[in-house]
Amino acid sequence: MRILFVSAEATPLAKVGGMADVVGALPKVLRKMGHDVRIFMPYYGFLGDKMEVPEEPIWEGTAMYQNFKIYETVLPKSDVPLYLFGHPAFWPRHIYYGDDEDWRFTLFANGAAEFCWNGWKPEIVHCNDWHTGMIPVWMHETPDIKTVFTIHNLAYQGPWRWYLERITWCPWYMEGHNTMAAAVQFADRVTTVSPTYASQIQTPAYGENLDGLMSFITGKLHGILNGIDMNFYNPANDRYIPQTYDVNTLEKRVDNKIALQEEVGFEVNKNSFLMGMVSRLVEQKGLDLMLQVLDRFMAYTDTQFILLGTGDRFYETQMWQIASRYPGRMSVQLLHNDALSRRIYAGTDAFLMPSRFEPCGISQLLAMRYGSIPIVRRTGGLVDTVSFYDPINNVGTGYSFDRYEPLDLLTAMVRAYEGFRFKDQWQELQKRGMRENFSWDKSAQGYIKMYKSMLGLPEE
């Protein structure tokens, strides 16, 4: 099958959220399975620092009265062909910025559609989030090209219809009041990144005002769990952590804890409970809940806590203020740093993820992969990936809570803090998480089955 992934992000070149990990990993697995899979993404101004891009384009076109160029290269450390959409709107050195994102990504989507019609013609265009949402609309009457639309986060729905009608060709038959709604209606298949999230977005609590539409298209809605690149994220050979280890040499992991404590200025003590969090600092990730319990938890325990991420200025400021009250025990790192995030996964005892909603979540998978015990709220993909820890029967992979309430989060954190004292059970809990198989191979089989059903191909 010929499949083109269209996305605003792709690891390791351009990443803000989990969408980048999906687009950077899934095509590689599908290609190894014998399919002609390629990626189409913007030519951001910073890409030249990360890879070599040919000076001459392979194709030129016009979209929304704008000329653009297509450059062909290869996704780093893979054999996946990569098409870069070249236009001055994407030359600034940030993925998302300013007030013209709606225009920039509508142009990008239009350029991708033009390339599919007149350049390299796939059998399936796999679109990702609102940035590519107009592609299924434009391709609705192209019978030999099918479209898949993956919802990574329903909260971000793109520009409204009146705006699209003003800036570009918007078919008269387009339905839906924004890009996300239109994509969901016109795509041949719609996927979300976990089975639980696929069910939740059909309810008012999680549907972001599209729950009725999601229920209406339930026949073509699929929840396929995300995976992780088990080779790219592997504590046995990760060059970004001080000490490599695996499930059979878990005793070596403490060296990473000590190194992390030294790096952020904590007291070096292997017996201290070290908790970490790598996240966007936004309400979705449970920051409002954390602000209600973190100060009290830090005051009544000797926990060490490191937070990595950026987001809303309010949450950044509040976290800084709490950290200032616990010098040497709490560190707030307001930046994007993949190397530091890996050291947090490899060095912390527990990983905090109290999300209000979570389509799938990658961080909890990486935490378990590296032996950090997740503390999560049971929502979306966190339900599908982290099983409740029962110390009596010694089963489960993490600490979890159901209600989005401060007391429930605090209880889960205290349970983890107390559980850390029982070293043998804690190590068994770590090993169970590290043995979990969240590779893309299993997820890829689900996508292949769906692709074949779209094209009328028999399942092998």
UniProtKB/Swiss-Prot annotation:
User: Pathway, per Swiss-Prot/TrEMBL?
Assistant: Glycan biosynthesis; glycogen biosynthesis
Q: Gene name?
A: glgA
Record-given protein name: Glycogen synthase
Q: Which Pfam families match?
A: Glyco_transf_5, Glycos_transf_1
Organism the protein comes from = Trichodesmium erythraeum (strain IMS101)
What InterPro entries does UniProt report for this protein, alphabetically?
A: Glyco_trans_1 (IPR001296), GS/SS (IPR011835), Starch_synth_cat_dom (IPR013534)
Q: Which GO terms describe its molecular function?
A: alpha-1,4-glucan glucosyltransferase (ADP-glucose donor) activity; alpha-1,4-glucan glucosyltransferase (UDP-glucose donor) activity
Q: Which UniProt keywords apply?
A: Glycogen biosynthesis, Glycosyltransferase, Transferase
Indicate which residues the UniProt annotation says bind ADP-alpha-D-glucose. Answer: K15
GO terms classed as biological process:
glycogen biosynthetic process
Presence of keyword Transferase: yes
- Assigned EC number: 2.4.1.21
Could you tell me which SUPFAM superfamilies the record lists for this protein?
UDP-Glycosyltransferase/glycogen phosphorylase
Catalytic activity entry: [(1->4)-alpha-D-glucosyl](n) + ADP-alpha-D-glucose = [(1->4)-alpha-D-glucosyl](n+1) + ADP + H(+)
**This protein's record includes keyword Ubl conjugation:** no
Task performed by this protein: Synthesizes alpha-1,4-glucan chains using ADP-glucose.
